[in-house]
Design a protein with these regions (language model features):
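Alpha-helical multipass membrane-protein architecture
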Residues: 1-585
Length: 585
């Protein structure tokens, strides 16, 4: 869009590109929402042939979830985008804004961005497509590290990609450190501790598929089966705490909508263009209509005409989607990563427990809970993604109402596309294993099946995470950032600290504050280039792999030398990042 508008010499190219970016981003958030849950329908259908999964179930759940996400987020736009301006890093929005501005201005700003984009893109493309060096460096590279991992369950990992390094720079050292501390608490305390205290035990009360003792598992397995659930509990409780803290904002947003519905407010007439949202009357009416459509969808399709099940389901979906909208937006504003899968997993667990209590269980209950989870997951994914678009528009002077209106169009097209593609991919490849194995959806299926069969969930682990979030809040430590670190894999958290440390280094080397600021801004340009280049070439590499072009030598990647090569390449990338950021004039 930037290139085409520049070549065509459009007068309002920047504003148009903001709208285009906002529409185009719909596909990513709709896919993220759908792919975490809805493939689980096909996974369970393979075990329960009596289950029916249709295109309309996938399409409607994605569409209605996306629309709800937009409608529920708009009342909170002003708080996250304007009122809290300068208090959240908004890493993804920062990177995209730099790309749009550089495309508009060209010259001195475009050159470092394009150079970093080419370097970061080529770097990540080489790793993903050719495998010249390993994507991750781990302490398993040597025999001592391997023994430490197997005996003590201690392991250190770092993703050596350019995109994640750039993301860490924009997040900054403060939040990156909190996220990393959460990750280290899980990987270096909880995982080894579980092996030490429960080494001879088989903890499978909530997952009968677990047959190994804790001591015989790898650190990664202990994290996946147990420790990650503590992070999920922490995210859920941090979300509840966030809801309580932002209750006045929620109340004022609902109050404003109620006033406008009653025709008692004309405040919108005095609002400047760059702060003008869609009318709260439109939002309220749109929300009611959408929820009615969800009720009809649930009643006639998912719940098979059971009114009680339908009413319970809509209360759960509407309540969780609305309340956790602020959590999704907050997570994106801090670290650029939406913990939507964790929140959706909690939604599925809650939905399953409640639906079983009202008499819906078995395969039909699995379908109902997964479709409910699909609506919630897509709504939260859309809310998190859209707050990024709105922040970009805020920085670049766009009219929020226009972004909001066009977002609905992108949602409709994306939902239809996702539904069709998902059915084709399931029939062609399947989601249970192989090239298109959907790990999050498989996890959802693994959790929901025993719940609907009356087995249970890891409530104790969720409770530990919840208590930890409360303690962190009392200690004035951002609980959501810490819990995100507990949930996100270690190898993705360490690069955030590395990038944040680079940010701190280049902005503190001089006694001249203006020079430090210039260096920081130059680093932001380079980080944005790393993110954009890495993301773009990642898509190209994935398309090649999907098309059957696999040029990676697995034998080489299994060799310890590939990890040493990764460390050298990563060090060179960091050196370039620092040198280029320091060189401002």
């Amino acid at each position: 869009a930037v290139g085409v508008s520049g070549a065509a010499k459009r007068k309002n190219a920047l504003g148009e590109n903001v709208i285009i970016q906002s529409i185009g981003a719909c596909s990513g958030v709709i896919v993220a929402g759908a792919i975490f849950t809805l493939p689980a329908l096909y996974i369970l259908q393979a075990k329960y042939p009596e289950m029916t999964v249709t295109f309309m179930q996938v399409f409607i759940s994605s569409l209605l979830g996306g629309v709800l996400g937009i409608l529920f987020l708009i009342p909170f736009r002003k708080y996250f985008v304007s009122d809290m301006h300068g208090k959240y890093p908004f890493p993804e929005a920062t990177a995209t804004t730099q790309v749009l501005i550089s495309g508009e201005k060209g010259g001195s700003q475009a050159k470092p961005l394009l150079m970093a984009g080419m370097i970061g893109g080529l770097y990540d493309f080489i790793v993903a497509t050719f495998g010249w060096w390993n994507e991750n460096f781990t302490t398993r590279v040597c025999s001592a590290g391997e023994m430490l991992a197997e005996k003590a369950k201690l392991v250190f990992k770092v993703n050596t990609g350019a995109a994640v390094l750039g993301l860490g720079y924009i997040v900054g050292l403060k939040y990156a450190s909190i996220i990393c501390f959460g990750s280290l608490a899980v990987w270096w305390i909880i995982v080894p501790g579980m092996s030490l205290f429960f080494g001879d035990s088989v903890l499978n009360q909530w997952n009968p598929d677990i047959t190994a003792t804790v001591g015989s598992m790898s650190p990664e397995q202990i994290f996946s089966y147990y420790a990650k659930s503590i992070g999920i509990g922490g995210i859920a409780m941090a979300g509840v705490i966030g809801i309580i803290k932002s209750w006045s904002i929620i109340r004022s947003a609902v109050g404003l909508a109620a006033k406008e519905m009653g025709g008692k407010s004309d405040a919108e007439k005095n609002i400047i263009r760059t702060q003008r949202d869609l009318s709260m009357k439109i939002i309220a009416i749109g929300s009611i209509i959408t929820l009615i459509l969800v009720v009809l969808f649930f009643y006639f399709d998912v719940m098979q005409g059971n009114l009680v099940h339908t009413l319970v389901a809509i209360l759960l979906v509407a309540g969780i989607s609305f309340l956790f909208t602020t959590v999704a937006a907050n997570a994106i504003a801090i670290v650029g990563t939406n913990p939507v899968s964790g929140m959706t997993l909690m939604t599925l667990i809650l939905a399953s427990v409640v639906m079983v209590a009202v008499g819906l269980k078995g395969p039909s209950g699995m379908v109902a809970s997964l479709v409910m989870g699909g609506v919630v997951c897509t709504a939260l994914s859309m809310a998190g993604g859209f707050i990024t678009d709105l922040k970009i528009g805020y920085w670049l002077g766009s009219t929020p109402a226009k972004q909001e209106a066009w977002k609905f169009l992108g949602t409709i097209v994306s939902a239809a596309t996702v539904g069709g593609v998902m059915i084709i991919l399931n029939k062609t490849y399947g989601f249970t294993s192989g090239q298109l194995a959907a790990p999050q959806a498989n996890a959802m299926a693994a959790v929901i099946e025993p719940l609907m069969s009356g087995v249970g969930a890891p409530w104790m682990l969720y409770g530990i995470g919840a208590v930890l979030a409360i303690v962190l809040t009392l200690l004035k430590v951002p609980a959501l950032a810490f819990a995100l670190g507990m949930f996100i894999p270690l190898e993705l958290n360490i690069p955030l600290v590395v990038g944040g440390a680079i940010n701190w280094y280049v902005t503190t080397r001089s006694k001249d504050a203006s020079l430090n600021t210039e260096r920081g801004e130059k680093g932001t340009l380079l980080a944005s280039g790393f993110i954009a280049g890495g993301a773009l070439m990642g898509v190209v590499s994935a398309a090649m792999r999907f098309g059957g072009i696999n040029l990676v030598n697995d034998a080489w990647l299994n060799n310890t030398l590939s990890q040493l090569a990764a460390l050298i390449a990563y060090a060179l990338l960091i050196l370039y990042f620092i040198k280029a950021s320091m060189k401002v004039k």
